[in-house]
Amino acid sequence: LPSGNEIGVRYSAQLFMGDGRGPEFEAISIDYARYNYYNIGFRTGLNLFFDDEVCDYYSIPMQFTWRTERIRGLVFPGDGEAGSWVAAALLSIIPKQFEAHTGFTPGMMLGPLSREPYSGNFLVKHRFSCTYDLGVRLIIPIWRFNLYGDFTYHCYLTDNFGFAYGDYRPGRSYMELGVGLSFNF
């Protein structure tokens, strides 16, 4: 498509990685991306996190992206048998475009600091947060719409979480798994 703008909505979960434990989040995101020459672009938006232990958490991703051209012409040369129809159906749902992104995501955790957690063991130590992000997006284009799966590694650069009981320090590495729908214009 000749246009280079994209707006989308995504649901995701951030899962703790590594040794020990850490709070896990669910998020709804609205984002905007602009692509220029050579499919290099910039993506930003608003992430709204939902978690009982952390309260309200909002962040704004600032990511540089690179996207491949759409892969066209994946057609299975079938002979009309049932097996060829199955192969054609499978080829129609594989991703036909890929994106790599990296950047930083500053955010703000609202609500009282160091309060007793609702349903867990973690306390918010500092309101401001910042993560370094590195990820890929697998895209299934449908006309001007994109269905996608998003896999992003986040490393918290700020020390935001404390353990309510003891001196244990939660890890800072998270893997975000998301699905979304975007529109190109």
Region spans (language model):
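Short glycine/proline- and aromatic-enriched beta-strand/turn motifs that initiate or cap beta-hairpins
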Residues: 1-49, 184
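Helix N-cap / beta->alpha transition motif
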Residues: 10-12, 61-69, 180-184
